[in-house]
């Protein structure tokens, strides 16, 4: 007999405004407990120093979290010129202090050099793993691990404020871009060094900034539910976004329910008007029920790639 999961079955995505000072996994575990969810996962770690958008996926939505991991990100960052730290942020120790002789024109010219596709070597103080361990664990032990450079794209990087030794910027970038590394490299270009003092992720994919909620707000709703003796899900679940919001950027292929049944049993189908190639978001019927993602095979058919398992099917299998 299958081991029963602890927690309730719930599917969807919630946009958490991660506070500073805790890890992304700590954030995930707190929210998972509040929702009493049986299954949950985050979509890419934020540094403890960083705040902002952290999409968390529940239940079947975890199947599509990779699309959020691979999506574009937006950040607001404040850097302090004149000081380098061993972590490239204010959590580390100052290892070098230099005089700052920078004007706005020079700063803007250097910032412009980061736009476009370049190679970036990840920071040792990152969550990137080497032999199963995050790089920052090696760094804390004083061990330097060789890292391969990776292609990143900075779609835009704009100077918002330059006051004294503080530089504030907005960055729109591809996955895997380390803002601390950009800041460190900028400091070297300017000849004075720099480190991050504030970092906030303001966007993941096309999720609305205003849809973010704090852990404190969720805890307040949970307390209210207990106080008023109502089910917590009545207050918490309306904050969830649909599971297909993680793949909303994919082209939709809507099919009649008969074809959807074939797809849900693993069979490719011919759908009029489907794209000629690529990955697609599959929906069924007039209500456009999300059933999973598929790809266009060599015969031009829509073939299942990752399917939603509906709750009634789960219950039947028990």
UniProtKB/Swiss-Prot annotation:
Gene3D superfamilies linked: Pseudouridine synthase, PUA domain
TM region(s), chain numbering: none
Class of enzymatic activity (EC top level): isomerase
Species the sequence originates in: Aliivibrio salmonicida (strain LFI1238) (Vibrio salmonicida (strain LFI1238))
Residues the record marks as active site: 47 (nucleophile)
Keyword Zinc: no
Its EC number(s): 5.4.99.25
Gene Ontology terms describing biological process: mRNA pseudouridine synthesis; tRNA pseudouridine synthesis
Alphabetically ordered keywords of this record: Isomerase, tRNA processing
Primary role: Responsible for synthesis of pseudouridine from uracil-55 in the psi GC loop of transfer RNAs.
Family designation: Belongs to the pseudouridine synthase TruB family. Type 1 subfamily.
Chemical reaction(s) catalysed: uridine(55) in tRNA = pseudouridine(55) in tRNA
UniProt name for this protein: tRNA pseudouridine synthase B
Pfam family, one: TruB-C_2
MF term (GO), any: RNA binding
């Amino acid at each position: 007999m299958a081991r029963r999961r602890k927690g309730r079955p719930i599917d969807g995505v919630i946009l958490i405004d991660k506070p500073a000072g805790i890890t992304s996994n700590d954030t995930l575990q707190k929210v998972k407990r509040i929702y009493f969810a049986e299954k949950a996962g985050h979509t890419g770690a934020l540094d403890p120093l960083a705040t902002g958008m952290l999409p968390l996926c529940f239940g079947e939505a975890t199947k599509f979290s990779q699309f959020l991991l691979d999506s574009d990100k937006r950040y607001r960052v404040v850097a302090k010129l004149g000081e380098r730290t061993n972590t490239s942020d204010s959590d580390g120790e100052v290892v070098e202090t230099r005089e700052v002789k920078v004007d706005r024109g020079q700063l803007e010219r250097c910032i412009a050099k980061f736009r476009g596709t370049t190679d970036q070597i990840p920071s040792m103080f990152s969550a990137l793993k080497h032999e199963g361990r995050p790089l920052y664990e090696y760094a804390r032990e004083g061990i330097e691990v060789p890292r391969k450079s990776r292609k990143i794209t900075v779609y835009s990087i704009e100077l918002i404020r330059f006051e004294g030794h503080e530089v504030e910027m907005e960055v729109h970038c591809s996955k895997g871009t380390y803002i601390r590394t950009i800041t460190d490299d900028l400091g070297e270009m300017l000849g004075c060094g720099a480190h991050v003092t504030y970092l906030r992720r303001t966007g993941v994919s096309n999720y609305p900034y205003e849809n973010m909620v704090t852990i404190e707000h969720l805890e307040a709703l949970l307390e209210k539910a207990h106080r008023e003796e109502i089910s917590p899900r009545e207050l918490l679940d309306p904050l969830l976004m649909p599971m297909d919001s993680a793949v909303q950027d994919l082209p939709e292929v809507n099919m009649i329910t008969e074809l959807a049944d074939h797809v849900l049993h693993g069979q490719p189908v011919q759908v009029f008007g489907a794209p000629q190639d690529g990955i697609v978001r599959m929906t069924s019927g007039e209500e456009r029920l999300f059933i999973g993602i598929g790809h266009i095979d060599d015969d031009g058919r829509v073939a299942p790639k990752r399917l939603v398992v509906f709750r009634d099917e789960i219950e039947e299998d028990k």
